[in-house]
């Protein structure tokens, strides 16, 4: 029996219902549209299928740790509680992308630094000083997404790598190209 888990597909505002229908058509379960995203459940095969076949998704995320935090110190402590060794080793590289809609967390870059510090300190506490994964902005082994809404924090794995709109036919960008995800959404809505 395959084990289902929660996933989140990010999209543009206004395309949530179109993406939800696409996911249902691919066999996703418990599909729930939200604000610029659609949550759903499925197994590993569904994760791959969503990345390959969804025309109106920008990214497919897999939530790994949810918690509440009132400030950046609490964010650091709660992020440090996660077993980061289950995702990477001290030889791995990682990157963090942060989106914050909160009165308390107003600087997404500072949030990124605090989560990065929590991950680095988790490894240093277990493997010794200097034994931690490196940060790499491009082509990291593990891509982490931090989403904050109010005091609710979700840490997710980004299974897509680059934004899915870049998987199209273009070799190079032209002066004013239309995003492939947006174009697909417009066609599907018409």
Regions found by a protein language model. Give the residues of each.
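Glycine-rich adenosyl-nucleotide cofactor-binding module
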Residues: 127, 148-190
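Accessory substrate-recognition/RNA-binding modules or partner subunits associated with SAM-dependent
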Residues: 2-142, 150, 159-161, 165-166
